[in-house]
Curated annotation (Swiss-Prot):
May play a role during plastid development. The lineage of its organism: Eukaryota, Viridiplantae, Streptophyta, Embryophyta, Tracheophyta. Expressed in germinating seeds. It is found in: Plastid, Chloroplast outer membrane. InterPro entries: Bac_surfAg_D15, D15-like. It comes from the Eukaryota. Belongs to the OEP80 (TC 1.B.33.2) family. Disruption phenotype: Reduced rosette size, delayed senescence, and reduced starch accumulation in chloroplasts of sepals. GO terms for cellular component: chloroplast outer membrane. Keywords: Chloroplast, Membrane, Plastid, Plastid outer membrane. The keyword Membrane applies. This is Outer envelope protein 36, chloroplastic. It holds the Pfam family Omp85.
Length: 321
């Protein structure tokens, strides 16, 4: 099977590193959000094994070349001030940059990915059970290609008690080896932790998200509680080599030796730089309506900071788990 060019808009965050003075890094950094255009060329083969009554399995191998374009602005201001009759130099570098998402520091990465996916699904009048496991292995055909192991699982269970239908779901995953920032597990938003924006809870090398719902067939309503965490792994999300090189260039321009301050800049951890908590929970209620398009979903959620969000969606209870 041939997989063509894919283009998508993914929610990411841009930030302004702020002012760097000659003695270190100031604490007044501002941030803003936007979109990053990420394109991926993928060529590969899929092999689907014969499915049993409840289990199915798919194995695939793909050559992938994700890439994007980096836009940046770099300028330096130097100011002379007089103190005790002598001029002293101070300055700042404003570095307005869309942080590179790629591991290589170039406009694209290259990787060969072997993927194994297994699914179990069972649905009866009394309830439903669902489990899926994905394992991806990056194969270093060439020395500078990415090598990693990434797995993700989703387990769901629902049991019917008269008109009530409680449903619980647990999602988790982790990645070891080479990693690009766009491979981080995103936590927050519809389908994850409701009450937060997309990726507003955090992004890390690992994640664990729990969702619980109690639906009532008579009222077509549901109450829910979501919680998610990056398991403290956001600090392990790397910064691109291009970003590292340019931050070192800033240090050279400023001619200071505050290695600790520079280390804080290049340590990665985009969640910390953007004030993401790394853990969050949300709760609320929703309504479900059947329509020719599917199940219409309306959820009203509040998070740990008492912020409220209204979600709309079209989903199917059996497939969304």
């Amino acid at each position: 099977m041939f997989h063509g060019i894919k283009g998508c808009m993914i929610p990411m965050y841009w930030w302004l590193l702020g002012d760097l003075d000659l003695n270190g890094v100031r604490n007044s950094a501002s941030s803003y959000s936007g979109g990053v255009n990420l394109s991926k060329l993928a060529v590969g083969l899929d092999l689907s094994e014969p499915a049993s009554s409840k289990w199915s399995s798919t194995t695939s191998v793909k050559f992938e070349v994700p890439g994007h374009y980096l836009l940046q602005t770099l300028y330096m201001c130097v100011r002379l001030t007089m103190t005790d009759g002598r001029y002293q130099r101070s300055g700042r570098i404003s570095y307005n940059m869309q942080n590179s998402l790629l591991c290589s520091g170039n406009t694209h990465d290259s990787m060969v990915v072997l993927k194994q996916e297994s699914r179990f699904a069972k649905a009866t009048d009394q309830g439903l059970s669902h489990f899926s496991m994905q394992i991806e292995q990056g194969i270093p055909v060439v020395s500078n290609w990415l090598i990693f192991n990434r797995f993700k699982f989703v387990a769901s269970k629902g049991v019917r008690f008269g008109p009530a239908f409680p449903l619980a779901s647990l999602t988790g995953g982790s990645i070891v080896g080479d990693m690009t920032p766009y491979q981080a597990f995103a936590i927050g938003g519809l389908g994850s932790v409701r009450g937060y924006g997309e990726v507003a809870v955090g992004s890390g090398r690992s994640c664990l998200v729990a969702n619980t719902e109690l639906a009532n067939k008579m009222t077509e309503g549901t109450i829910f509680l979501d919680c998610g965490t990056d398991l403290g792994s956001s600090r392990l999300v790397p910064v691109s080599s291009l970003y590292l090189l340019r931050t070192r260039t800033i240090k050279k321009l400023l001619r200071h030796e505050n290695d600790k301050a520079v280390a804080e800049l290049v340590s990665g951890n985009p969640s910390l730089r953007q004030g993401k908590p790394g853990f969050g929970y949300g709760f609320g209620y929703g309504l479900r309506f059947k329509s020719p398009l599917g199940h219409l979903q309306v959820d009203y959620a509040m998070n740990a900071f008492n912020q409220k969000t209204l979600y709309f969606g079209i989903t199917n209870l059996a497939s969304s788990t």
